[in-house]
């Protein structure tokens, strides 16, 4: 496995918002949902020099991420430090050893990054089986990811930008 540089805790990342993720002007937790077989949630690093161009280019070519007839786009800003501090508990308030990490993913654009949810070194992927010791705690991958989604929603600062 190739070791990548860590993103500094002082950075912010931005999740580009699909218009379907807004209801009555409010961001919904669906904005932070992994699709089946996805290993990470796509975000962009705001500190990278190509950030604004990367995001505008993406939004311009994907109408569902445009607001007010293509005049604006929205992003949910997240502090990397806050994302890494997310904790997952199960019903009896037992803390699970789940790590939420933000890592560079320059596969699409220079500013692209991913938010990974892991148990040990295993990525938590929607609707997949959890490791055996987690299964004994009667917890599913979907329950873990749901907790993380709600936490991300609480941490997110919505920002509107001109296209």
Report the location of each language-model feature:
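Signature of Gram-negative chaperone-usher
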Residues: 14-18
């Amino acid at each position: 496995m190739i070791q990548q540089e860590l993103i500094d805790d002082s950075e912010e990342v931005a999740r580009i918002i699909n218009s379907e993720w807004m209801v009555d002007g409010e961001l919904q937790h669906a904005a932070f949902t992994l699709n089946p077989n996805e290993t990470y949630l796509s975000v962009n690093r705001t500190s990278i020099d190509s950030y604004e161009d990367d995001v505008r280019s993406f939004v311009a070519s994907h109408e569902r991420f445009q607001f007010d007839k293509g005049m604006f786009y929205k992003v949910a800003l997240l502090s990397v430090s806050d994302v890494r501090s997310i904790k997952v508990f199960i019903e009896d308030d037992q803390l699970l050893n789940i790590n939420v990490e933000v890592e560079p993913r320059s596969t699409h654009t220079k500013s692209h990054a991913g938010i990974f949810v892991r148990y040990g070194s295993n990525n938590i992927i929607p609707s997949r089986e959890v490791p055996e010791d987690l299964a004994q705690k009667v917890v599913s991958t979907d329950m873990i990811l749901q907790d993380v989604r709600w936490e991300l929603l609480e941490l997110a600062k919505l920002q509107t930008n001109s296209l």
